[in-house]
Amino acid sequence: MSSNPSSVEKKLLHYTGKAIADFNMIRHGDRVMVCLSGGKDSFTLLTILNQLRIKSGNKFEIFAFTLDQAQPGWNDACLRQWLAEKSIPHEILTRDTYSIVKEKIPEGKTYCSLCSRLRRGIIYRYAEENGFNKIALGHHRDDLIRTLMMSILYNGDIRSMPPKLLSDNKKHIVIRPLCYVQEKDIITFASEQAFPIIPCNLCGSQENLMRKKVASLIDQLAIENPKVPSNMLHALQSLKPSQLMDQNFWNFKNLEDGLETAQSVQCEEVFNAQEFEFEDEKI
């Protein structure tokens, strides 16, 4: 920890440490691979985790992993120098996913989905081959609530980015220690630390990404009610299945069985859902 940490640094240490404790993200002896993209979020994550590692008495390891996806203009010289100065173990691995994305995705379409899928596969494989049992990503509070809003508006489901995730193949635990941290605090901290930010030119060239629209919408709502972002984060931790419509989580069809006056006899349904089906129906 810095000898005289700034107020925002103290705030980051507090909320990151709280998230780690709340969700048991890091245990004694864990080998944590921090995905360092070169952006403000991942630089902040690595810096704060390194300070917490020292604070813990080195009860866990951290390793910085950077994937060079062969994007035009990529220059990691400053990144390498920064990592060397911090004495943080690291590797910068080059894999040309850029050419694949440009070939597969038509001009004008968003690259994010394919790009992230390719990147995720490489990250998982590297972690497994090198014995890292935790993979740390730099998503913050605002990423979580924007993803929630995007899922509702554009995908028609309720999901976000969990603070701790077991991968589908059951081989990896992914953690998001910055899940309580506000983006504005990361911006302030990144400026204080003068991180050698490497911009993502691939994504930055697409001005009409859905995420930017949703971020703008949330910002507008927060002007009228500053509690909107924190309320959205709280909503992710306060699901009430009985107040929603998902029959996988609440037995709406047989609620009558819970009545104090419920009869033990099986009652026949008046209608069958198949009677009202239409082809390609979507309410």
UniProtKB/Swiss-Prot annotation:
Locate the motif PP-loop motif. Answer: 37-42
Pull one GO CC term from this UniProt entry: cytoplasm
Biological processes per GO annotation: tRNA thio-modification
Positions bound to [4Fe-4S] cluster: 112, 115, 203
Per its UniProt record, the required cofactor names are: Mg(2+); [4Fe-4S] cluster
- What does the note accompanying the cofactor annotation read? Binds 1 [4Fe-4S] cluster per subunit. The cluster is chelated by three Cys residues, the fourth Fe has a free coordination site that may bind a sulfur atom transferred from the persulfide of IscS.
Signal peptide (from-to): none
Q: List UniProt keywords, sorted A-Z.
A: 4Fe-4S, ATP-binding, Cytoplasm, Iron, Iron-sulfur, Magnesium, Metal-binding, Nucleotide-binding, RNA-binding, Transferase, tRNA processing, tRNA-binding
Q: CDD domains annotated for this entry? A: TtcA-like (cd24138)
A Gene Ontology molecular function term for this protein is: tRNA binding
* Catalysed reactions, semicolon-separated: cytidine(32) in tRNA + S-sulfanyl-L-cysteinyl-[cysteine desulfurase] + AH2 + ATP = 2-thiocytidine(32) in tRNA + L-cysteinyl-[cysteine desulfurase] + A + AMP + diphosphate + H(+)
What PANTHER family has UniProt attached to this entry? AMINOTRAN_5 DOMAIN-CONTAINING PROTEIN (PTHR43686:SF1), SULFURTRANSFERASE-RELATED (PTHR43686)
* Family, per entry: Belongs to the TtcA family.
The name of this protein is tRNA-cytidine(32) 2-sulfurtransferase
Organism field? Legionella pneumophila (strain Corby)
